[in-house]
């Protein structure tokens, strides 16, 4: 079975574990994805007769994998790091956000959360003038495992659609009587308690970046977290075209030269005037992350301090090499305004 898995999709294996897909580049016959919903008779998420636990932190996800699915944990030679790679032959279901939204639109019996997700999608489509196939709903709604406290996880596909949706969100958040609200200080405290479990950062630095993000907030009282993902025809990289080499760990101070890819997952910040505070010293030209929490983290001309893995990036097709900082799975990985 051939599966074209995209950031924000979910896949389910033969043991009924549900994984969230990361990125757009995957090895042959395997999908880079991490466990999100784990079957457990004592779980607090219900779907028909099955119970699940939702796993949040990367530490807990890897603990589960090492215990129950150790053969999924591999050192990938192309990415030069340890990843969870799900064999395609183990996948029994592929959940697609666009198809989920289509089903919500045609359904006659939606939950309160599903109805709210549909309303948010309709609002974005109208205000940003988007086609329906550019929008999807991911997360617990996609898996049919939402709880009363669940948030809404919309996804926008295609660069131009993403830029239009982002601009529409900015405008909507300015209307104090509208359905969208930015996070308050109290909301940010709750978010900080959740995020600080696996990303080290003090509250003041956290508020400086998170308070101005438009991809997260409240819609009619329900949290939303939006992802912006490039479409397949914008992604030419195939597995093996580019090789990544781990050169160690570093902390740098740099100026953001280009933030045009800051909203996307994965996000990218071109940097200049780089000073290495600690660690290896190759000429780093960008900061990259596959984690949504690092989107919209800084703007052009701002100075940042970032800490993460230093990687050599070799593109065999373009015969080009450069160096980057990858903000990944370690709690010590961070990027803050200087």
Predicted region positions:
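Catalytic core of pol beta-like nucleotidyltransferases
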Residues: 1-149, 157-338
């Amino acid at each position: 079975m051939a599966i074209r898995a995209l950031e924000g999709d979910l896949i389910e294996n033969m043991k009924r574990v549900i994984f969230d897909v990361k990125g757009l580049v995957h090895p042959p016959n395997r999908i880079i994805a991490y466990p999100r919903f784990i079957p457990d008779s004592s779980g607090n998420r219900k779907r028909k007769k099955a119970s699940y636990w939702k796993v949040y932190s990367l530490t807990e996800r890897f603990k589960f994998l090492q215990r129950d699915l150790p053969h999924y944990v591999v050192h990938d030679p192309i990415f030069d790091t340890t990843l969870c790679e799900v064999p395609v032959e183990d996948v029994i279901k592929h959940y697609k956000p666009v198809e989920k939204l289509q089903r919500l639109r045609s359904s006659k019996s939606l939950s309160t959360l599903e109805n709210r997700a549909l309303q948010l999608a309709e609002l974005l489509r109208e205000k940003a003038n988007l086609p329906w196939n550019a929008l999807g709903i991911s997360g617990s709604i996609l898996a049919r495992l939402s709880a009363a406290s669940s948030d809404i996880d919309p996804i926008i596909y295609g660069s131009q659609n993403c830029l239009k949706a982002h601009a529409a969100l900015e405008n909507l958040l300015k209307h104090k009587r509208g359905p969208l609200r930015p996070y308050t200080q109290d909301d940010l405290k709750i978010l900080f308690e959740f995020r600080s479990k696996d990303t080290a950062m003090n509250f003041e630095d956290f508020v400086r970046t998170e308070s101005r993000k438009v991809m997260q907030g409240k819609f009619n009282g329900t949290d939303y977290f939006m992802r912006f993902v490039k479409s397949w025809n914008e992604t030419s990289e195939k597995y093996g075209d580019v090789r990544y080499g781990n050169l160690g760990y570093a902390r740098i101070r740099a100026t953001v030269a280009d933030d045009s890819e800051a909203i996307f997952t994965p996000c990218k910040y071109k940097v200049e005037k780089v000073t290495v505070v600690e660690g290896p010293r190759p000429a780093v030209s960008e900061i990259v992350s596959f984690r949504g929490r690092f989107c919209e983290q800084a703007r052009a001309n701002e100075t940042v301090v970032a800490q993460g893995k230093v990687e050599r990036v070799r593109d065999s097709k373009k015969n080009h090499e450069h160096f980057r900082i990858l903000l990944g799975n370690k709690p010590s990985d961070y990027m803050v305004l200087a």
